[in-house]
């Protein structure tokens, strides 16, 4: 026959196991343990934060929220990528996780895996936006 102390210990252990399982389920549902997520806000034609750090070779999910009443874009890449988009006439981007259109007052989610350590810019190349300061930087850490 179990003593009251053993029963309390057993109940406490059972409760601890259930609580641990519940916390693990919540953490998994919240995305903890999944790919890193970085939120970038667009307000007054500026990116916040204007600099982020990511690990090389790991998928990173970016949630880009446009709080402005005008459209923007988020182009991430090296100088060659940025130069291409500066001279490109296509303001609508579909299917490329490193070049996304962000309509006014909406959010867009994209996932990017950076394969080389270093620095890349994220810029909005819609007319006048880069000159106004819509530029940010990604530092890709080894």
Residue locations for each model-derived region?
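Bacterial N-terminal signal peptides
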Residues: 14-24
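Beta-strand cores of secreted/periplasmic/IMS beta-sandwich domains, seen most often
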Residues: 51-75, 107-116, 120, 140-141
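Boundary at the C-terminal end of the N-terminal hydrophobic targeting segment
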Residues: 27-31
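N-terminal edge beta-strand
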Residues: 32-59
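Extracellular/periplasmic metallocenter environments
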Residues: 46, 98-142
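Bacterial N-terminal signal peptides that target proteins for export
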Residues: 3-15
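Short, compositionally biased
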Residues: 76-82, 126
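Short aromatic-acidic-glycine turn motif
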Residues: 80-90
């Amino acid at each position: 026959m179990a003593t009251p102390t053993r029963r309390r210990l057993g109940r406490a252990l059972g409760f601890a196991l259930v609580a641990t399982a519940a916390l693990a389920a919540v953490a998994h549902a919240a995305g903890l343990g999944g790919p890193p997520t970085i939120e970038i806000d667009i307000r007054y034609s500026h990116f916040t934060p204007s600099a982020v750090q990511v690990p090389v070779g790991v998928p990173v999910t970016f949630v880009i929220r446009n709080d402005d009443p005008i459209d923007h874009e988020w182009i991430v890449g090296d100088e060659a990528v940025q130069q291409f988009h500066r001279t490109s006439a296509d303001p609508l981007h579909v299917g490329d996780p490193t070049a996304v259109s962000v309509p006014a007052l909406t959010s867009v989610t994209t996932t990017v895996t950076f394969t080389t350590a270093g620095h890349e810019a994220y810029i909005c190349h819609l007319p006048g936006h880069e000159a106004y300061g819509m530029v940010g930087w990604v530092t890709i850490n080894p």
